[in-house]
């Protein structure tokens, strides 16, 4: 309830309503904050990757993805198990969209400048890949990183660059 939220953060209900109209608005703000943290980690990955070393970049982003799905990560199975499936789906949708937007505006453009673009509908392809990999790793946490890497490379038509 809103009273529970206000009590947990140490504010009055009236102060809560000063900033937020309802619980959905709070949830949206929290989701945006968590997604911004994920984007910051991607920006760090992007800044430190070796230009032109696509194989290493894929290895590193697979490790990053796995860390985001770990038990305490933002994409963990625990969020669903805690009864927040609808919120989790909202989160996945928004996160995949923003991550795709970030990658298509940065890493993908750099790749295109050097190699051309082996895929069309970049944003939609990345969105589908992100949602799919999150689900795959969450459902099969023991899946080998090489398989995850191969799925990403095949989806993005990167095999000839590895």
Where are these regions (language model features)?
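Helix-turn-helix
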Residues: 1-25, 29
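Residues in soluble alpha-helical coiled-coils and helical-bundle/repeat scaffolds
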Residues: 21-25, 29, 70, 138-142
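An amphipathic alpha-helix signature
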Residues: 28, 59, 63, 96-108, ...
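Hydrophobic alpha-helical connector segments
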Residues: 29, 43-71, 126, 149
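Short, basic, alpha-helical segments at the C-terminal edge of helix-turn-helix-like DNA-binding modules
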Residues: 32-39
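Amphipathic alpha-helical packing segments from all-alpha helical-bundle domains
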Residues: 39, 85-113, 120-124
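Amphipathic alpha-helical segments used for helix-helix packing
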Residues: 60, 66-93, 135, 139
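Hydrophobic alpha-helical segments that form the core
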Residues: 64-66, 116-139, 146-157
């Amino acid at each position: 309830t809103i009273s529970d939220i206000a009590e947990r953060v140490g504010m009055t209900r009236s102060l809560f309503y000063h900033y937020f109209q309802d619980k959905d608005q709070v949830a949206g703000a929290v989701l945006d904050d968590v997604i911004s943290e994920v984007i910051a980690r991607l920006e760090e990955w992007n800044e430190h990757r070796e230009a032109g070393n696509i194989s290493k970049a894929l290895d590193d982003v697979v490790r990053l993805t796995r860390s985001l799905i770990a038990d305490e990560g933002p994409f963990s199975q625990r969020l669903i198990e805690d009864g927040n499936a609808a919120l989790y789906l909202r989160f996945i949708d928004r996160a995949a969209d923003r991550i795709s937007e970030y990658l298509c505006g940065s890493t993908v453009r750099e790749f295109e400048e050097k190699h051309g673009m082996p895929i069309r509908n970049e944003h939609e392809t990345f969105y589908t890949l992100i949602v799919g990999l999150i689900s795959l790793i969450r459902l099969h946490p023991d899946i080998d990183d090489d398989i995850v890497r191969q799925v990403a490379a095949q989806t993005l038509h990167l095999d000839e660059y590895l």
